[in-house]
Amino acid sequence: MSHHKFTEQDIVLPPPTIRAPLDRYFLPPVLYNRCYRDRIIAKGIAVPLVIGLERENGLLSRFETIVDSSEDPETLRYVERIIKFLLWSRGGWKLHFGGPKVIADHLRKNYSLRGSRKFDCQMMATAYGRKFEFVHCTPNRVPSAKESHLEAGGNLKGCRIGFDLGASDYKVSAVVDGRVIFTEETPWDPKVQKNPEYHYHHISAALHRAAACMPRVDAIGGSSAGIIVDNEIRVASLLRSIPHKSFSLAAAVFKRIQKDWKVPMLVMNDGDITALAASLSIRQNGVLGIAMGSSEAAGFIDKNGNILGWLNELAFAPVDYNPKATVDEWSGDAGAGAMYFSQQAVNKLLPAAKIKLPVKLGLPERLIELQNLMIKGDERAAKIYETIGIYLGYTIPHYAEFYDYAHMLILGRVTTGLGGNIVLAEAKKVLLQEFPEIAPKVTMHVPDEKMRRLGQAVAAASLPTLKN
């Protein structure tokens, strides 16, 4: 097998069996991580590493792996990227590092307000309302796991309202004993609003319109873009223009609405509700949902049918270890998911495909142009979808190191039309050739008519459990 020097540290790795046509130096983390672990096991130098991430209400996620006890560049890269992935998949304000002290000392500098991962530390502090902490201990002193295990929806009894808040419209549904009796979609423009009353009145008015169709309201469930923790909006573009002094009032809009209605109410991030809608539709658990839209959104239902309350902000989680990968403008990091599974990925690949579009075109319009080229049978356009499909094929087993799933739901505008078929076909090809042990364990789904009909708002309505 030919070997290709991929990284600045000259780690010699077998290249991917299937190369991405428009991104020759794409370095799948799953190949790097396996190679690293195999090497330290073969040399007999592996020691345990346990990472614990503490988030709201004492909840804690644990992740166990092995490392070399020295601070060589390969080990630092292996551990730093895993921490980065865990922060954005699980979330947390306190990181318990149960492993070699030399590695902890090095990474503590990175994960600080003065380090290279300042963005990540600030976002975690904002999401959880606590200063970000990095503490070192021995592996056996990392606290035991404590997950939230919220039974994932499917509660259809009674008179319920579900809503789904997006960036340009919101949907509301009235559901009586599982039957949808009212549904409505309303445009809005929350991003530019400076007054928190705008969000409160829009959502409240929608709930009242749905309530008017039912004899009573027993429960309200919601789905919203952004980071939702404990029924509060902690980070969201929906509140982008709210001034700092009004932010806490705006963030507590759901708690304020619950006080008005005095019924069980639960709001979750839209990614988890997408996975829930899929789980209810296919009647299976262990679902990871990946939406390729303006960014990458994700959600997860575990194999016991629970929503774990993880962050699942995979737009920021690394999926390419090529040090020269495209840098995400917001986080300042290379190889983040949004640059591989969204309209941003399409835009990134256009120059490599030698497709020139007018500079003034926004990302959604660029995707439409690409879809039009596909309809005309343009080979250059097909190469973009092939590349995204190969990214996905190598990322499915990478995600499987962090999520125990048997079903992957792929949705979003990037996956629609002829191009979407290529994405799925290429991903399956990679799995069969490179990961034959994983291929039979993961079934890929695209939203069918039933799933679309069910929709986010109806799935959200099934979240709260009724009080006896």
Question: Across the structure, where does each feature detected by a protein language model lie?
Answer:
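Structural motif
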Residues: 52-55, 95-101
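Conserved glycine-rich phosphate/nucleotide-binding loop
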Residues: 435-468
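Phosphate/ATP-binding catalytic cores across multiple sugar-kinase/actin-like superfamilies
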Residues: 210, 387-405
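Glycine-rich phosphate-binding loop and adjoining helix at the ATP-binding site
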Residues: 68-80, 84-90, 101-138, 186-203, ...
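Short glycine-rich phosphate-binding loop at a beta-alpha junction
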Residues: 89-99, 216-225, 403-414
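A short acidic Gly-Thr/Ser loop motif
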Residues: 99-100, 155-156, 163-169, 290-295, ...
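Glycine/GP-enriched mid-protein hinge/lid loop-to-helix segment characteristic of carbohydrate kinases
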Residues: 2-62, 74-75, 106, 116-118, ...
